[in-house]
Amino acid sequence: MTDLPDSTRWQLWIVAFGFFMQSLDTTIVNTALPSMAQSLGESPLHMHMVIVSYVLTVAVMLPASGWLADKVGVRNIFFTAIVLFTLGSLFCALSGTLNELLLARALQGVGGAMMVPVGRLTVMKIVPREQYMAAMTFVTLPGQVGPLLGPALGGLLVEYASWHWIFLINIPVGIIGAIATLMLMPNYTMQTRRFDLSGFLLLAVGMAVLTLALDGSKGTGLSPLAITGLVAVGVVALVLYLLHARNNHRALFSLKLFRTRTFSLGLAGSFAGRIGSGMLPFMTPVFLQIGLGFSPFHAGLMMIPMVLGSMGMKRIVVQVVNRFGYRRVLVATTLGLSLVTLLFMTTALLGWYYVLPFVLFLQGMVNSTRFSSMNTLTLKDLPDNLASSGNSLLSMIMQLSMSIGVTIAGLLLGLFGSQHVSVDSGTTQTVFMYTWLSMAFIIALPAFIFARVPNDTHQNVAISRRKRSAQ
């Protein structure tokens, strides 16, 4: 990339900072949740909605981000994304109640949903095709550093300042990024087809109300009648989308995608698999602080081995899949992650705290292998004219399943515990033990889906996508 013009390199730095802001905010909040609960006068059992409100908003808004960038221009949308994310951070820091914090997190999510996909689109437009891979590696590297720094930085700020600072640190970075975007980034636009607003609204309503209904009376305090009504609305919205998308060439996501068996299996496995995996980044720091009495900073440091294991495994995951095939790798890593989850709980309850970093490192390795394998399995056989749509649907499903996973984790805590779980409670570790056992069971379930992957899905096919007609 040394032969790129200086202006292009500055534009890549802007995109990289956007990736860093979004990835840092995804993990920095987790270690602060118990302190937030105490400050806001809420039960820790309700704080999972701080994560759900952000991730669910990202899932809902993702399908619109690419179309908006093509229609309005990448500079305008990227600038808007940074401004919304920064304003959301400010409102989060100023929140005095949980409901205010949830609304502010949703505003952050709107910005976060546009930041990463529009950033990728920007790189595609400003960099020659032969240098695209090197440029994407450069801009995504800060996105890998964010999860590494997030838990420890969040714990440090909570312990030595207050939880408000995990949001306030975004403000100067956001201001600099917004100014740099206006000054340096070109405003590429493209001719766009008509946006499928009806399909977008149907999917948004379906995802949002079903997730809210899943949270149920334990999290939102809704009556059984209200929950039943939400489920009915959500199911009807999704069924209407299926009817809307059938034989509709302008549909948000074409149903032709599901004619590819590996896409259908991979998408179903990714959805179910990330529900289980999505529980772990939320539950681990909460358990370390509330269940074991760790300080926020100590709990944040304990998350670093998991990120290191994940980053290290990415270097060899292709060779592993080529050697053993998708079915074996996905079934083995799914069951392995379930066992590692049980190992973490057992080690923690026995008081072998010095072993926990090694267990979390192993968890990161297994999880990373499974994530990479799920992603490539889902997309590898799609025809070229459906690849972009399939990738967008996968990105949306990834965010949606993570929000559902965190919601289920909060629901499990509510089922097994009282409304006020604290370090001083004698039953706290028992509550977490039952929750962890349930999580291990949920994590293992997608193995039944991955067992249906064709046995010959392996080796060089892992990297290439067959070109064939979508008709």
Swiss-Prot record:
Keyword terms, alphabetized: Cell inner membrane, Cell membrane, Membrane, Transmembrane, Transmembrane helix, Transport
Cysteine disulfide partners in this protein: none
CDD domains: MFS_LmrB_MDR_like (cd17503)
Family: Belongs to the major facilitator superfamily. TCR/Tet family.
Keyword RNA-binding attributed: no
Gene Ontology MF terms in the entry: transmembrane transporter activity
Transmembrane annotation, as ranges: 12-32, 49-69, 77-97, 102-124, 138-158, 165-185, 197-217, 225-245, 263-283, 286-306, 342-362, 396-416, 431-451
Side Cytoplasmic, residues: 33-48, 98-101, 159-164, 218-224, 284-285, 363-395, 452-471
Name used for this protein in its record: Putative multidrug resistance protein MdtD
Topology, Periplasmic side: 1-11, 70-76, 125-137, 186-196, 246-262, 307-341, 417-430
UniProt organism field: Escherichia coli O127:H6 (strain E2348/69 / EPEC)
